């Protein structure tokens, strides 16, 4: 009878109550049990009060209860039926749903972040392309404007240069007139000589008549010869006048390795050159310094000023139209 009553009393007690009673009989405190089982005091208290911690899985809680039972010498076989009936260990089943919803929110946030990143990237690429296109268009417009200005300058030079042949023709006509009239004074001398010669016969008279004509022909030939010999003597003077500007210390010498457009003006605003220069061309200019240069392709030209090369590397690196001014440097006294 006593054994059955004890068994019924044990069944009436819960798992936590039995473990607490066993611990008190052994004289152990909750702190001592927690230290031996390597648990928190709050976990031991929850087990004795038949509470299931929300942050603890049921599998771990069952293992803690078995370890607690072995520590206080309570048979595990007596506790297992009580655990099945009481089912105090309620695990939170919402956790998987929470993790799923959390992952969904995180995925949505990552999607928004990726979309924003792509948007910023497209904006940066678009702005870069627009900036490049504006610079390219401005460069092309500048080259077109320079070409139009050079064409207008060439047309103006052609219009002003049409009067040059007329002036040279007048000069040549004035030069040739004295040469043609020069032989005239020689005829009176020959005629006086002819009148002083006596004419004894008709044949002699005919001979004397023919002689002045021959003398005139000879005189014209001899007078024309000095004129012909004097004419080439003027050529070296004109050639020397053309070559004279090259000796100017402020001369500007340019050699072209490729086709290049350029414009050169001096200090007075006079346009010394404006137009296109072809490959392997040379250009010698003289004027009043300083010179203002505008070069479409700096890499295609080599410039020497006052016998020194001009550095165009900064324009070649940036591939821009070169605009520079060459100032006159004082020449040393000799």
Swiss-Prot record:
Regions recorded as binding DNA: 30-49
Recorded topology in the membrane: Single-pass type II membrane protein
GO biological process, one term: regulation of cell shape
Main location per the UniProt record: membrane
Intervals, Cytoplasmic compartment: 1-111
Polar residues compositional bias, start-end: 161-175
HTH cro/C1-type domain segment(s): 19-71
Low complexity bias: start-end ranges: 176-210
Classification via SMART domains: HTH_XRE (SM00530)
Cellular localization per UniProt: Cell inner membrane
Disulfide links within the chain: none
Region forming the signal peptide: none
GO molecular function: DNA binding
Family annotation (Gene3D superfamilies): lambda repressor-like DNA-binding domains
Keywords: Cell inner membrane, Cell membrane, Cell shape, DNA-binding, Membrane, Signal-anchor, Transmembrane, Transmembrane helix
UniProt-listed Pfam families: HTH_25 (PF13413), RodZ_C (PF13464)
One GO cellular component term: plasma membrane
Region feature Disordered, mapped onto this chain: 152-210
Periplasmic side: 133-334
Transmembrane segments: 112-132
Family membership: Belongs to the RodZ family.
Job of this protein: Cytoskeletal protein that is involved in cell-shape control through regulation of the length of the long axis.
Free-text comment about domains: The helix-turn-helix (HTH) motif in the cytoplasmic domain of the N-terminus is involved in the formation of spirals to maintain the rigid rod shape. As this protein is anchored in the cytoplasmic membrane, the HTH motif may contribute to protein-protein interactions to form the RodZ helix, which is localized beneath the cytoplasmic membrane. The C-terminal domain may be critical for determination of the rod shape by probably interacting with enzymes required for synthesis of the peptidoglycan layer, including PBPs in the periplasm.
Protein name (record): Cytoskeleton protein RodZ
Gene: rodZ
